[in-house]
Amino acid sequence: LFWALKGGGGGSFGVVTRLTLRTHALPEFFGAVFGEITAASNEAWRALVARFVDFYSTSLFNAHWGETVSLKDGKTLKLSMVFQGLDQAQAQAAWAPFFAWVRERKEYSFAEPAVMAIPARHFWNPQFFQKHAPGLTTMDARPGASPDHHFWTGDGEQAGWFIHGYQSAWLPSGLLAPQQQALLVDALCAAAAQWDVALHFNKGIAGAPKAALDATRDTAMNPAVLDAFALAIIAGGGGPAFPGMPGATVDEERARRSATRIRSAMDALLKAAPNAGAYLSESDYFQPRWQDAYWGGNYARLARIKAAVDPGGLFFVHHGVGSEDWSADGFTRVKPG
């Protein structure tokens, strides 16, 4: 049961009332690299994506780097990377070859990137961010809110949003091999022509230290995460839509159009990674092969645990373990128990 709760979708198995957290020693510094690079043509755009993929494979595919790089607005590469275990000078040195390559070419517009390092123990201190990096986080403005309540400013748009489409895929590290990079680059560019693509490097475990790989291997998650250098997320939505929510509006035509483009973008990306797994918590509500996508070879064991601890099917989750035995609303058993 403990194994199943670690990645199997906890709500499918019971109610967790208490847990113990494992803590880890902090490095001296955490830090971030921010920037945007826009290409002037399709040819320059593909060259930029190719250069970044090669740079990532040789310089960032390690335990120091994570978070995201996004392909957005057709021809813009947005950098939102974080690092740990490096100081600011080391982080700047790591990126210097890539930034020099961009600066040498007139087909790219590029504002100077921001590279910052902060003491790791201040990473959750909102007052530190307000003083040293204003705008990076936003304070909770509700009356009476605790002074330690803050959130990443870029996440603010998710409050109350209505999701039109949400797709994810684990991208295998083999795509970073020199002979496979062209396939990956073509797929990324084709997908980004349809919709923005975010590569979440911290959510792929390949390149992590052995201890982290071993700990992840001892979970119910799709084992594909162990060999993934990134989780690709292609998603979009709009403002509040449910009745009673402030400012609720419904634009069904726009929502369906967005959903179609999001699916098309993921279809294009999956040409480089057919049958890629997906992350349970950030994935397609309509995932057709959800058992394999979410859990791979672990699903059979999860199903046996579900049958043992919840034979009556009290706990039902859409596309959760054992949900194929029930109607879509979870109230009618459609397969014998």
Predicted features, each with a name:
Residues L1-G337:
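Soluble FAD-dependent oxygen oxidases
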